[in-house]
Design a protein with these regions (language model features):
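Transmembrane helix boundary and interhelical loop/hinge segments in multi-pass membrane proteins
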Residues: 46-49, 126-127, 172-182, 191-193, ...
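Gly/Pro- and small hydrophobic-enriched strand-loop and loop-to-helix capping segments
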Residues: 192-194, 232-233
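Membrane-water interface segments at the C-terminal ends of transmembrane alpha-helices
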Residues: 13-44, 60-143, 148-173, 202, ...
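Transmembrane alpha-helical segments of polytopic membrane transport and secretion proteins
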Residues: 1-19, 96-98, 271-290
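Interhelical loop and adjacent transmembrane-helix boundary motif
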Residues: 3-13, 50-61, 225-275
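Glycine/proline-centered hinge or cleavage motifs at structural transition points of membrane proteins
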Residues: 187-188, 201
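Short amphipathic alpha-helical coupling elements at transmembrane boundaries
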Residues: 42, 51-58, 102, 132-139, ...
Length: 290
């Protein structure tokens, strides 16, 4: 009996150690999601449990916000991940300039979305440095409009999202055993063949995760769409529709339904990317060293 009691004590201790983390997750993630899900089926104006979802998908001012958000999130994801791969590949080895270059590339993370948007208004605005430089160099004579439209929001998503994609790709590329490429080089593989035949297949899991996280971050765009876009026009994203329902119309039930739709679209895209990964790679999650 004493043996059973003593053997059960470590397991009970581990359970108690996990309890605070579980309580934290339930309080901050599970409960708000469950509450919002239930609230979405309780429309403020009645009409049945699915009234909010019916209103969203039949309102010409609401359902197009999904397409608008996708038109911003998908290109931003492709650009961020596509540029992050060669940059991370170039900085994969330790060198005197590697840390300096990495620090410069991740600076936007420390500034915050609002500060980045304010800086972009100063730099890319009609009277900003960038348009004035183009006009001064006679490279472009017409009016340059890179703010308060689609391009302003897209640029903001690229500037703020690239550091995350870069750091993810840098960690994956740095984790690939360099002796694999050196072995291929001894067999006559040039640098491009080394990248295409060795690094790229092993990077598929990292590419997928970076793309998923970049997409989720870009799809939830809100400050950039308001500050650098046209929130009543071409950059009225789904998060703006949810904010208007909650804070202008005080219809928290409809806002919850919009948030659920937003989460479902994100989940659908992420699941599609994770499923597509199996067609390109079926090995371990990383190509780690050793």
């Amino acid at each position: 009996m004493s043996t059973l009691a003593s053997s059960g004590t470590p397991r009970d201790a581990k359970a108690w150690l996990v309890t605070p983390a579980l309580a934290f997750i339930v309080a901050l993630f599970v409960y708000p999601f469950a509450y919002g899900l239930v609230l979405s089926f309780e429309p403020m104006n009645g009409g049945g449990a699915l009234a909010n979802y019916t209103q969203f998908f039949t309102d010409a001012a609401m359902w197009p916000t999904v397409l608008v958000t996708l038109k911003l999130a998908v290109p931003a994801t492709l650009i961020n991940v596509g540029v992050a791969v060669p940059v991370a590949f170039a900085l994969r080895r330790h060198s005197p300039y590697q840390k300096f270059a990495t620090t410069l590339l991740v600076i936007p993370v420390t500034l915050g979305t609002v500060l980045v948007a304010d800086g972009m208004l100063t730099y890319f605005g009609p009277n900003g440095w960038f348009p004035q430089a183009l006009h001064g160099l006679r490279l472009y004579t017409d009016e340059v409009r890179l703010t308060h439209n689609y391009w302003g929001v897209l640029l903001s998503l690229i500037v703020s999202g690239f550091p995350f994609a870069f750091l993810l790709m840098l960690s994956y590329i740095s984790g690939i055993d360099p002796t694999l490429a050196r072995a291929a080089a001894t067999l006559g593989a040039n640098p491009w063949q080394q990248f295409r035949r060795i690094y790229l297949p092993l990077l598929v899991p990292g590419l997928t995760m970076a793309a998923c996280l970049s997409f989720v971050q870009a799809f939830s765009v809100f400050p950039s769409a308001v500050l650098l876009g046209a929130p009543a026009g071409p950059t009225r994203v789904i998060s703006i529709a949810a904010a208007e329902a909650a804070f202008e119309n005080y219809d928290y039930s409809l806002a919850s339904a919009i948030a659920i739709v937003m989460g479902f679209v994100q989940l659908l895209v992420v699941a599609s990317m994770l499923g597509a990964r199996r067609f390109f790679y079926s090995g371990p999650v990383t190509g780690g060293k050793g």
